[in-house]
Regions:
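Short extracytoplasmic
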Residues: 1-16
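Short loop/turn segments at strand-loop or loop-helix junctions that form parts
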Residues: 12-13, 68-73, 213-220, 259-264, ...
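Membrane-embedded segments
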Residues: 16-107
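C-terminal regions of proteins
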Residues: 39-42, 276-277, 283-363
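Extended hydrophobic/aromatic segments used for targeting, binding, or gating
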Residues: 29, 234-308
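Secreted/periplasmic serine-hydrolase-like ester/acetyl group-modifying domain
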Residues: 14, 97-243, 345-363
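Extended, charge-rich low-complexity interaction segments
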Residues: 63-85, 102-112, 127-135, 320-342
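Loop/turn elements at helix/coil->beta-strand transitions in domains of secreted/extracellular proteins
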Residues: 5-7, 35-36, 62-65, 251-256, ...
Length: 363
């Protein structure tokens, strides 16, 4: 809410809720950095709903810096869950998308996917036209403009009644700040992170946070042995959804750093998740990014076996957050113009989402 503070969008999902003393919000606040992370995405978020969220803030993304966590776990065979998408989707996102769409491959794919995941969406006739590559009539455009204005007014009205919520700050950030040294030093922070993690991962063999293990895994861990043996992330509509996000970043000339997190390697071994398949997925994601000019990538996908790198089965914590900070802080603290992105609409196709060959041979 501070107008003078530079807020930087950090796009992701449930990793932002994995608080410990090395969490990006804690470090930014404790060491009074020149920016504050603005976390976007909750549990169950993925690229498709991030894309629609971006429609509401396209002017704020223009020429700015962003951080984007892209989790290989999103890339399941069936893709994004319709109920999760509908839970986060709202009418303001819809009118923002409809009023800003350019009738291009991105607009068409977004409309097709929207009808798949939300068949009863408002203004479905307009969405249907876009999905077929047709132009909207001037009547439809006026109607969308009117609805967008109404949504903005409603938003402004209700935001007057929203209490300034400092609960997250008081409960999740302040308590951790007290444990950190006043002078910033990665060496000192690593010692604190390791000591804290050691204490909090004592009740299981996976190096998972005690509380998470007790509440989420302890009662069913025996049943989960080998359950991911056949899991694959190589074929998924999520690759096409990711392309929407890349297209938006290119249009907004946003300079982005992408974070690829690992899986807890002990958990990976226990559940039978193939490390080779995971790396093939990462290679496919990286090719989609790098071949279009998105070359700022912090790839932690092979670090799931490092001590106290992971807080649970798939989320970073402690030393993982410090590795994240070493990559992200210099990038965000020293903003640079976006590179000249070369968007390739072939990444919207089913051929790409189902492709399992060498990524660089995809034509």
């Amino acid at each position: 809410t501070d107008k003078k503070m530079r807020f930087v969008p950090f796009f992701g999902s449930s990793e932002w809720l994995r608080f410990d003393s090395m969490h990006p919000a804690v470090l930014a606040e404790k060491y009074d950095r020149s920016y504050r992370p603005y976390f976007l995405g909750q549990r169950g978020a993925a690229s498709f709903n991030q894309y629609f969220g971006m429609q509401q803030m396209s002017s704020e993304l223009e020429g700015q810096t962003a951080v984007y966590v892209v989790s290989p776990q999103w890339f399941t065979k069936t893709g994004y869950d319709a109920s999760a998408f509908q839970q986060y989707f709202n009418s303001d996102q819809l009118t923002a998308y409809l009023s800003q769409q350019q009738g291009d491959a991105a607009a068409q794919y977004a409309a097709q996917r929207l009808l798949q995941l939300y068949p009863d969406v408002a203004m479905a006739e307009s969405v249907q036209k876009l999905s077929e590559g047709k132009k909207l009539s001037s009547f439809e455009e006026r109607h969308i403009e009117m609805m967008a204005h109404l949504n903005e007014r409603q938003d402004a009205f209700f935001s007057n009644f929203a209490a300034l919520n400092n609960e997250n700050y008081d409960q999740r950030i302040l308590p951790y700040m007290a444990d950190l040294p006043d002078t910033f030093s990665y060496q000192a922070l690593e010692e604190i992170a390791t000591a804290e993690a050691k204490k909090k991962t004592s009740n299981n063999q996976f190096g998972i946070d005690n509380q998470f293990y007790k509440t989420r895994l302890a009662g069913k861990v025996a049943k989960l042995r080998g359950f991911q043996t056949k899991q694959s992330y190589e074929k998924s509509p999520e690759y096409n959804d990711l392309q929407l996000v890349l297209d938006q970043f290119a249009k907004s000339k946003t300079n982005v750093i992408f974070i690829i997190p690992p899986v807890n390697s002990k958990w990976m071994e226990y559940t039978g998740l193939s490390p080779e398949m995971y790396q093939r997925t990462v290679a496919k994601i990286r090719y989609q990014l790098e071949s279009q000019g998105f070359t700022n990538i912090a790839d932690f996908s092979k670090d799931g076996d490092k001590p106290y790198f992971m807080q649970d089965t798939i989320h970073m914590g402690w030393n993982g957050w410090l590795a994240f900070d070493k990559a992200v802080d210099p990038f965000v603290a020293n903003p640079q113009p976006a590179p000249n992105y070369q968007i390739n609409d072939r990444f919207f196709t089913k051929e790409w989402s189902q492709y399992t060959g060498k990524p660089e041979e995809f034509k």
